[in-house]
Amino acid sequence: VHQDMVGDDNAAFERAVDAALAAGARVLVSTGAVSQGRYDFIPAALRARGAQVLFHKVAIRPGKPLLFARLAGGALFFGLPGNPVSAAVGQRFFVEPLLRRQLGMADEQPLWLPLHSEMRKPLGLRMHARARILLDAGGHLSAQVLPGQESFRLKTTVQANAWVVVDEQ
């Protein structure tokens, strides 16, 4: 595992990518600089390196600006959003499944549970909600979506012991 930290600096990013590839990395993961802001230079930097951007932006919340690319030498690159909760969603639902497959591990199997209370979500987006699994007096499990699902709220991430994933519909 090669690890590096760079700021919003294209040249430093290039050096970090080169160092990771020289160390034999087959999957690279970065956080930040993948959206559309002034300092979001990674999509252009990857294209300049000859990378093929396979997707950039996904219909999920949180974590929409996620980027996935194949670098010129074949290594894979995940550009996760800089927001901590959005980055956690990208890691959990995109990076980890790919790594499991590359390691020959079986896909995870979801645990289907009733919701403890009603939940609203935007149409057309897959929602990844921080939740707690509850056990009632009768021995039945349910999933409680925690209040404060905005991606800037970190407290619910600490309180959660599960994710509730609700499809686009």
Residue ranges of model-derived segments:
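N-terminal small/polar loop signature for handling phosphorylated ligands or for N-terminal nucleophile
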Residues: V1-R49
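Flexible glycine/proline-rich
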Residues: A45-Q169
